[in-house]
């Protein structure tokens, strides 16, 4: 069995195992800020940032056809200090081609460039979306499972607990092809789940990068924070 795992219980500035892109930075207090915070402490609009684990993950074996199961956990908070215009845009866990650069921000969350279904993206993502774009369901916020498109194949509304820490678990079971997502707010006790069948061998390249991305909106003050406090990932590919 080929395994890879990493675990950050907090983040250290200058960590060699993480590649920061766009606005993303790690604070002295150990928080990964995916989008920009202005000097006045308020979130900036028109900001996109991502972090990637520096080593690629072997998701499936092109010789034997075996597929990896994986589990990732992270905790984050989204704080929305403004009520007008509507806060935007969200945070996303994604897996896709190695050495990719940030895509469009705003509602595309730094992972996609348009709203088309395009298999060349070779990307699987789980979004925590706070703004309803034309391709989104009307309910916001929502969890979405994205396969080669920002148009989610399945969504689940959730109630944002403003500024509070959310814990996420995303599991993929290769034999059943089930991707299962759980979002928990310890502060309120709220639990949200969503699951869908995804054939990762048909979606992803055999080697992928895994990352987190966040984006704020295209209008002045259409902004919120996207802060990540911990992140772990493990994958195992059978022989």
UniProtKB/Swiss-Prot annotation:
Protein's job: Galactose and N-acetyllactosamine specific lectin.
Cystines in this chain: none
UniProt organism field: Erythrina crista-galli (Cockspur coral tree)
Protein name from the UniProt record: Lectin
Statement: the UniProt record of this protein carries the keyword Glycoprotein: yes
Subunit field text: Homodimer.
PROSITE patterns: LECTIN_LEGUME_ALPHA, LECTIN_LEGUME_BETA
Transmembrane segments: none
Further comment: Binds one manganese ion and one calcium ion.
Family annotation (InterPro entries): ConA-like_dom_sf (IPR013320), L-lectin (IPR016363), Lectin_LegA_CS (IPR000985), Lectin_legB_Mn/Ca_BS (IPR019825), Legume_lectin_dom (IPR001220), Leguminous_Lectin (IPR050258)
A Pfam family per the record: Lectin_legB
Keyword Nucleotide-binding appears in the UniProt entry: no
Glycosylation sites: 17, 113
MF GO annotations: carbohydrate binding
Family: Belongs to the leguminous lectin family.
The entry's keywords: Glycoprotein, Lectin
